[in-house]
Regions:
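Active-site-proximal alpha/beta segments of enzymes that process anionic O-linked groups
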Residues: 2-3, 10-116, 198-215
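Metal-dependent active-site segment of extracytoplasmic phospho-/sulfohydrolases and closely related
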Residues: 3-13, 23, 141-173, 183, ...
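Short, solvent-exposed loop/turn segments at secondary-structure junctions
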Residues: 10-13, 82-86, 125-129, 167-169, ...
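Glycine-rich, phosphate-binding/catalytic loops in enzymes
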Residues: 20-26, 138-141, 176-179
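Structured loops at beta-to-helix junctions and adjacent beta-edge loops in soluble globular domains
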Residues: 54, 123-125, 186-188
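A long, amphipathic alpha-helix that forms part
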Residues: 100-116, 120-122, 127-162, 200-202, ...
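Histidine-centered active-site/metal-ligand motif
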Residues: 129-133, 166-177
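Substrate-binding rim/cap in mid-to-C-terminal beta-strand-loop elements of soluble/periplasmic
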Residues: 173-212
């Protein structure tokens, strides 16, 4: 299986214990972990463009497939929220029209299938779409994601970066989230004493692809 970069918009470490997850806490003890820093306001499109461009810039190509990270890694894109509907082999509208179960399962299914042939950059938007206005279903959303990550690892993916570009929603406004997201990966973050910046996630995935594929 080829390396994968999977971003989950709007999850935080604090809910791993609260929601009694199994897979993600176990992964934290096996591979490298850290904290992603992204100051308010945080928007999905701007956050993901920073990752795809590998630098903190407002320069956004009209076609995400032309972004530097995609061109360098030749990665397939799945459900990337730089536009609405999302961009890639699987795509949804950024509203609540697609259930969180449907999105998560379809993204992971497409990811496993595609990673057999190429590196993959994928996103899950469910926490961001549903938890701004309904915290009561938080652990249901987390549990579906946790189970899907287990399927991903059991599917043979061994080189990966799992992250959230920002933490949980903390209010009804779109750009209002906790400022620290998760980083769980088979490649070490650049500074163990510091947070991971968004543009560094793109650089780390580039390095992961190069080291895994020997290019």
């Amino acid at each position: 299986m080829y390396p994968i970069l999977l971003g989950i918009n709007g999850i935080s470490y604090g809910s791993f214990t609260e929601c009694e997850l199994n897979v993600l806490p176990r992964l934290m003890n096996i591979v490298d972990r850290g904290v992603v820093e992204n100051k308010k306001p945080q928007y999905p499109d701007k956050s993901w463009w920073t990752i795809l461009n590998m630098e903190p810039t407002n320069n956004t190509p009209s076609d995400p497939s032309l972004a530097p990270l995609v061109k360098l890694t030749r990665a397939a894109l799945i459900n990337i929220p730089v536009v609405n509907p999302t961009y890639g082999l699987y795509s949804i509208k950024l509203d609540q029209g697609t259930s969180y179960e449907e999105e998560v399962n379809n993204v992971i299914g497409a990811l496993i299938k595609t990673a057999a042939k190429a590196p993959v950059i994928a996103a899950i938007t469910a926490p961001d779409r549903f938890l701004h206005n309904n915290q009561s279903i938080k652990c249901n959303v987390y549990s579906v994601i946790d189970e899907a990550i287990g399927s991903l690892i059991n599917g043979g993916v061994s080189a990966f970066i799992l992250f959230s570009p920002y933490g949980e929603p903390v209010g009804p406004n779109e750009g209002d989230h906790e400022e620290y997201g998760i980083y769980i990966a088979t490649i070490s973050r650049p500074r163990h004493y510091d947070t991971v910046k968004l543009y560094e996630i793109g650089m780390l995935f580039r390095d992961l692809v190069e080291s895994t594929l020997g290019v």
